[in-house]
């Protein structure tokens, strides 16, 4: 399980909170200073693994349906687009420029993406109004409790949108590298050796990491353990918005045809 982050600089040499952490069930969590180091570590782990591998990432694998329609892409097209546009280096990335370009392509206005230290004509610092009838959350996100932040917010307290912009290109590179060995759930049937899935650590009881000096570390530790019993990948209908994989006994809600669970 992976706790992703959108730092624009390498994390400190000494492990800390608000950084990149990942964990295999039964092992101690690992700390990485950059996304590039983590990507390399994931590749080594996959290549060295015996049997099947489930990789869970805590960022959105897609956007609300209307955004995909406006961009003229399905989930594969979105992943390819972001991989082509995003430049991510240890001390710099262009995520705000890419978000502004996505706004131009999707609406021609400074929406839906927002949140930046330096506002521009196509990327505002504050939350904009969305076009009429356009939703802020995917169905799988709206069903969760606690409800997650919007993937459109890139900057500010609790923002998660930058993680998606910088994370999806890593997933796409894994997808291209491992080819027919790898599938992306729930867009593809989870029948291959390597399965990528979106997870939501905040569904776990906060008491598991409350008061811990590095809560990120504890989140991946407990999330990896939560899927120890296996996964029931069965879903009803899933489109290009995707779905979320939760541990057994997660939150209940009205739109759970886009959510699957681990086994108790």
Which sequence ranges carry the predicted segments?
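RNase H-like (RuvC/DEDD) metal-dependent nuclease/polynucleotide-processing core
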Residues: 4-54, 59-264
């Amino acid at each position: 399980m992976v706790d992703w982050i959108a730092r624009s600089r390498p994390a400190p040499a000494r492990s800390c909170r608000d950084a990149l952490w990942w964990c295999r069930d039964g092992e101690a969590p690992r700390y990485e200073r950059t996304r590039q180091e983590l990507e390399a570590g994931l590749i080594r782990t996959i290549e060295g693994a015996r049997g099947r591998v489930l990789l869970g990432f805590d960022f959105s694998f897609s956007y609300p349906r209307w955004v995909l329609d406006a961009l003229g892409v399905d989930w594969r097209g979105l992943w390819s687009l972001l991989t082509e546009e995003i430049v991510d280096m240890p001390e710099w990335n262009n995520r705000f420029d890419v978000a502004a370009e996505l706004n131009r392509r999707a609406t021609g206005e400074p929406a839906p993406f927002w949140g930046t230290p330096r506002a521009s004509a196509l990327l505002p610092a504050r939350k904009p109004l969305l076009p009429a009838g356009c939703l802020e959350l995917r169905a799988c996100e709206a069903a969760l409790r606690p409800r997650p932040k919007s993937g459109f917010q890139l900057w500010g307290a609790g923002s998660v949108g930058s993680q998606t912009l910088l994370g999806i290109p890593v997933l796409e590179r894994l997808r291209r590298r491992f080819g027919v060995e790898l599938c992306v759930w729930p867009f593809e049937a989870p029948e291959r050796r390597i399965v990528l899935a979106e997870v939501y650590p905040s569904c776990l009881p906060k008491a598991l990491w409350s008061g811990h000096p590095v809560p990120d570390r504890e989140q991946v530790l407990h999330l990896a353990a939560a899927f120890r019993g296996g996964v029931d990948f069965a879903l009803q209908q899933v489109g290009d918005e995707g779905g979320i994989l939760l541990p057994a006994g997660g939150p209940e809600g009205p739109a759970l045809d886009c959510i699957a669970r681990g086994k108790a």
